[in-house]
Amino acid sequence: MENPNNQTTYLVVDGENIDATLGLSVLDRRPNPEERPRWDRVLESAHGRWGQKAKGLFFLNGSSGFLPMGFVQALTAMDYSVIPLSGPAEMKVVDVGLQRTMDAIADLGKGDVILASHDADFRPQIETLLDQGRRVAVMCFKEFLSSQLHELEERGLEIIDLEYDVHAFQVRLPRLHIIDIDDFDPMSFL
């Protein structure tokens, strides 16, 4: 069997989906700079998850002809491969790019995947990878993850919370979450 340290964890990031969920669902407004994910922590978490080298693939929609170059340069400095895609207005180019990439990883016959998204559009690719015996995780805000992806936990899909598991934020986000009674501290509510 191949040494797991020779394997690669592909961190496949749906940048639009993470940003939209953070702004529209978690904060209900545009995030302040300190409320955005620390993408270096996200990549470090991917590396540490299964003890393998991690390759970050960050997908952006470039259909408008504009890219946030400061952000792109920062991602590149953190060793992400930034993949700006464009296409017709009616096409979800980032989703198509992510699907094709996950299909290509399946065709490689090796490598594990952490998908940063909440979107059920990737269920077929996740199922294929799970069927091949790959380790697959979704990195997200758990409460906003598609129920179609939650259903795959019993097949081996791991769910990783961006805030609670990865600690990707510098500030605590205003999220309502279920608290295990053993972790409940009434003083934090007083």
What annotation goes with each model-predicted range?
Residues 64-190:
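Nuclease catalytic cores that cleave nucleic-acid phosphodiester bonds
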Residues 1-92, 135:
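Domain-level signal for Mg2+-assisted phosphodiester chemistry and nucleotide/NA-binding surfaces
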